């Protein structure tokens, strides 16, 4: 019986390793596997830590840029939660949101790659090669695009680049896959001046 139990444990370990390309909330941090719209995360500090990122009481602007994430469920745009990687104004990850527009703030003390996997781990959302939240293949197709070009690697590995538009599409796609984003249309409470659009890798509208 003990040998059989050991064999089962080993098999489960190997199976988990084979299911790469996914985020993990940790054993005490369950991931949201429900339908959209998805809420703000709980246990914010713990989820920042699970993403392998530091937290601080202030925002660091040594490295400062922005990306934009759209999520479409059967052609409908769904909001990105407004407090990912952030707890009020008292706790910040270098990777966070301030509104539901999909604008992703990268404000870090030093250069590093920030990925979609980190974002979804902070959010507490399931993301694998086949599933996002409560939607999974083969029932629902899951694809991603970066600046309008289909991304063929695991979605979790997408690096959030300066000014980039990332679209994650679940089920039937929207009429148009966005290849860019409008800075002025995505101004949120953390943006005080439209001239900051230049900081996002975009031209300031005339």
Predicted regions and their residues:
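Bacterial N-terminal signal peptides that target proteins for export
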Residues: 1-8
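Flanking scaffold residues of small Cys/His-coordinated metal-binding clusters
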Residues: 11
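C-terminal motif of bacterial Sec signal peptides marking the signal peptidase cleavage site
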Residues: 15-18
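Ubiquitin-like/PB1-type beta-grasp interaction modules and other compact soluble beta-rich domains
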Residues: 20-206
């Amino acid at each position: 019986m003990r040998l059989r139990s050991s064999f089962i444990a080993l098999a489960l370990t190997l199976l988990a390793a084979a299911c790469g390309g996914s985020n993990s909330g940790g054993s005490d941090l369950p991931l949201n596997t429900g339908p959209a719209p998805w809420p703000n995360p709980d246990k914010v500090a713990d989820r920042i830590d699970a993403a392998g990122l530091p937290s601080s009481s202030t925002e660091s602007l040594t490295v400062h840029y922005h990306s934009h994430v759209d999520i479409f469920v059967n052609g409908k745009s769904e909001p990105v939660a407004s407090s990912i990687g952030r707890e009020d104004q008292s706790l910040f990850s270098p990777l966070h949101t301030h509104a539901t527009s999909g604008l992703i703030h990268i404000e870090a003390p030093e250069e590093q790659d920030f990925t979609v996997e980190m974002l979804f781990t902070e959010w507490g959302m399931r993301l694998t090669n086949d599933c996002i939240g409560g939607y999974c293949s083969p029932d629902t197709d899951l694809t991603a695009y970066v600046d309008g070009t289909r991304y063929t690697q695991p979605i979790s590995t997408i690096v959030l680049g300066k000014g980039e538009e990332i679209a994650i599409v679940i089920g039937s796609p929207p009429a148009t896959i966005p290849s860019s984003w409008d800075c002025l249309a995505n101004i949120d409470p953390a943006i005080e001046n439209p001239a900051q659009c230049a900081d996002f890798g975009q031209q300031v509208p005339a």
